[in-house]
Amino acid sequence: MKIFINGFGRIGRCVLRAILERNDTNPQLEVIGINDPANWEILAYLLEHDSTHGLLNKEVRYSNGKLIIGSLEIPVFNSIKDLKGVGVIIECSGKFLEPKTLENYLLLGAKKVLLSAPFMGEYDEKQYPTLVYGVNHFLYQNQAIVSNASCTTNAIAPICAILDKAFSIKEGMLTTIHSYTSDQKLIDLAHPLDKRRSRAAASNIIPTTTKAALALHKVLPNLKNKMHGHSVRVPSLDVSMIDLSLFLEKKALKDPINDLLITASKGTLKGVLEIDLKERVSSDFISNPNSVIIAPDLTFTLENMVKIMGWYDNEWGYSNRLVDMAQFMYHY
């Protein structure tokens, strides 16, 4: 399976690391090119030395247009001119979010495109589906361009799918307690859209927006107009937490809800949803490959209300779902 990565920032590098990790035991994925406008000597350094996920287990260097990782050589570029032979291009730059702009990759020769973000703009949702692996990926019908939704949507969708089926969700509110990202500022500096995100990321708790709850209906259509939410950015480098409050049509108790989640973690959602019984904290989940990790002691119920809290590595978990989805699309 031949993969091309466009954009070699946090997600692009995590995607490559995830592929390298999988290929150590089951070599099926071949990255045949990476594109990013940045200096490739610096990008090679950043791939090997990661402040969050640690040192790569192979030496990395750049030479003569190639990223050399141990004995592996990957052609790298500062612009894309040809994608012939590419099975799936994973778009990680954050710059091309409208489906029509992603069609350019098909014109250059790629067979399929996977976007590492929600789609923007007006588009046909059947032609350009939003899929969350483990929740609705089985609805894929060989479309050429797919959105992998957001890291937060990947975290809440498995929970909502389970609870809506069992209890019927009437409405819900989401708070994502989210580690800061490159969209914020290291020191106080003007943000183009958001006053609060203009403030120093590592020194403040910063309320801002998220479209994860509003966009959930693109994955679970039954929840359209039933969900809303916001984000609170916190001074941590990685790992986030969902605080999901739901009103259910049926009365629910803590133990039956947790039992449903635990059963799913061992069956249909194994590798996507995990259960934490050790009362761990955020740093314990760095480099956890699951989409969400539920702490059963942080499930609370009151009549028809339920609050569920879950951890997710917003970089590594999401990047692993991108690889899962790319493989699924390719082998469809």
Swiss-Prot record:
It is found in: Cytoplasm. NAD(+) binds at residues 10-11, 36, 81, 116, 314. D-glyceraldehyde 3-phosphate binds at residues 150-152, 181, 197, 210-211, 233. GO terms for biological process: glucose metabolic process; glycolytic process. Keywords: Cytoplasm, Glycolysis, NAD, Nucleotide-binding, Oxidoreductase. CDD domains: GAPDH_I_C, GAPDH_I_N. It catalyses: D-glyceraldehyde 3-phosphate + phosphate + NAD(+) = (2R)-3-phospho-glyceroyl phosphate + NADH + H(+). It comes from the Bacteria. GO terms for molecular function: glyceraldehyde-3-phosphate dehydrogenase (NAD+) (phosphorylating) activity; NAD binding; NADP binding. Pathway: Carbohydrate degradation; glycolysis; pyruvate from D-glyceraldehyde 3-phosphate: step 1/5. One of its GO terms (cellular component) is cytoplasm. The record marks 178 as: Activates thiol group during catalysis. Its EC number is 1.2.1.12. InterPro entries: GlycerAld/Erythrose_P_DH, GlycerAld_3-P_DH_AS, GlycerAld_3-P_DH_cat, GlycerAld_3-P_DH_NAD(P)-bd, Glyceraldehyde-3-P_DH_1, NAD(P)-bd_dom_sf. The active site is at residue 151. Homotetramer. Catalyzes the oxidative phosphorylation of glyceraldehyde 3-phosphate (G3P) to 1,3-bisphosphoglycerate (BPG) using the cofactor NAD. The first reaction step involves the formation of a hemiacetal intermediate between G3P and a cysteine residue, and this hemiacetal intermediate is then oxidized to a thioester, with concomitant reduction of NAD to NADH. The reduced NADH is then exchanged with the second NAD, and the thioester is attacked by a nucleophilic inorganic phosphate to produce BPG. Belongs to the glyceraldehyde-3-phosphate dehydrogenase family. This is Glyceraldehyde-3-phosphate dehydrogenase. It comes from Helicobacter pylori (strain J99 / ATCC 700824) (Campylobacter pylori J99).
